[in-house]
A protein has these predicted regions:
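N-terminal secretory signal peptides that target proteins for export/translocation
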Residues: 1-23
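Terminal low-complexity, poorly structured segments
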Residues: 18-21, 34, 365
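Generic hydrophobic-segment detector
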Residues: 25, 29-30, 45, 114, ...
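Bacterial N-terminal signal peptides
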Residues: 28-41
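Cleavable N-terminal signal peptides
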Residues: 35-36, 46-49
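N-terminal pro-sequences and low-complexity stem/linker regions of secreted or lumenal proteins
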Residues: 49-386
């Protein structure tokens, strides 16, 4: 991978960024730094830590059998260049993953801020949202991935780090580590109003048990806490004041260590077979990607809405987002696909969160929702693991 310089923000841009978007967490204990190679995967040895109205049904691309287990890990608010630059000493595991597994080099978030990216990845549209306000949940009363999985008899769970209990609708925990805006499943009324469905949204600690007992569902979504996903802002992971602030480096390390731990646990579990894959991506790029720096910030197709700033909402009480201007897509972020025995592959095709959804749906033979059904402008990620 060619060396890339870490993009530096202007003082003005950083001040806006630091007020809203970064964080850090204490280093994890118990992580063994020695990495082993399992197939193509560079992983550590770690201790166990409604109705269907969509496009026609899809089939997996030809080649290998469908994936038995699909894992999605959604990280936060960090750009492709910042993560994969060889000048960043704090994301070494992420760089190893990218160098030894599937890498989509032109993968983009859908928009800013966080929540509509999560909604896009699980329903195929943002439904007009560009806000993190959880009180807008009724807006998302639409068909979603959970509806599809259950209609097809595909087992699923969403594992949320620091979620107090299964299905808990708390907006944020007192320590600030769990935030509902990073949990799309409890933003859909037909999930959070259904006790059985909401019970499948569980604390991340449950995944250790499920991996150890071999009771891992076919579809797994993992959301780290607000420090470990590189977002930050909790008391234990304050916002950095500048790009060179040690708090910024700590955020990188926290996310890198989180992935080192959980990729290791997954790939050393009974669920890790030749028909399993882990999709690792970031919801959106850094704050600098919200400005029209050039074509690298904007991808073609339905993944690139240009939205006006959102004012404060007097109806819901939600604060305004992106008060400084417009949004040019969600920014350039990595998409790393870890699949056993596949090796390093690179796909330069433009892709984004609708591509992730399309890939999941095609794997399980589900209809294609919303923009995931735009087969002209949205391509799947199968070249990275088949």
């Amino acid at each position: 991978m060619a060396n890339q310089e870490v993009r530096m923000m202007t003082r003005q841009t950083w001040s806006r960024f630091s007020a809203r978007r970064l964080f850090r967490l204490p280093a994890w204990a118990g992580v063994v730094a020695v990495a082993f190679v399992l197939g193509a995967v560079v992983v550590p040895m770690a201790a166990s830590a409604g109705p269907v109205n969509s496009s026609s049904r899809s089939d997996p691309p030809p080649g290998k059998p469908p994936l038995k287990h699909v894992f999605v890990i959604m990280m936060e608010n960090t750009s492709y260049d910042d993560l994969l630059s060889s000048t960043n000493p704090n994301t070494t595991f992420i760089q190893q993953l990218a160098a030894n597994n599937g890498l989509a080099t032109n993968y983009f978030g859908v928009t800013h801020v966080s929540l509509p990216n999560y909604i896009a990845a699980t329903s195929g549209q943002t439904w007009g949202s560009n806000s993190d306000d959880v009180l807008q949940a009724p807006l998302f009363d639409h068909q979603n991935l959970v509806d599809q999985l259950e209609a097809a008899g595909v087992s699923w769970k969403a594992y949320m780090e620091n979620l107090p209990s299964p299905g808990d609708l708390v907006t944020a925990t007192p320590d600030g580590l769990y935030v509902r805006k990073h949990n799309p499943f409890l933003m859909y009324p037909d999930v959070y109003q259904n006790t059985a469905r909401a019970g499948n949204v569980v604390p991340l600690t449950q995944l250790s048990t499920d991996l150890a007992t071999g009771k891992v569902p076919q579809f797994v979504w993992i959301t780290p806490n607000i420090c470990n996903d590189m977002h930050g802002g909790a008391p234990s992971c304050p916002f950095p004041s500048s790009p060179t602030d040690p708090l910024q480096a700590a955020l990188y390390k926290d996310g890198d260590n989180f992935l080192r731990t959980w990729v290791g646990l997954i790939t050393h579990s009974k669920a890790w077979t030749g028909h399993s894959a882990i999709f690792i991506t970031w919801d959106e790029g850094g704050f600098e990607d919200q400005s029209p720096f050039g074509p690298t910030d904007i991808r073609p197709g339905p993944d690139s809405p240009i939205l006006a700033a959102t004012p404060a909402n007097p109806t819901t009480g939600g604060g305004g987002d992106l008060a400084g201007g417009t949004v040019y897509g969600g920014g350039h972020v990595p998409m790393i696909v870890v699949a056993r025995g596949v090796g390093h592959r690179v796909d330069p095709t433009f892709a984004g969160h609708y591509s992730l959804l399309q890939t999941i749906e095609q794997n399980f033979g589900l209809p294609l929702l919303g923009n995931a059904g735009d087969l002209v402008q949205v391509g799947n990620l199968s070249s990275l693991f088949r």
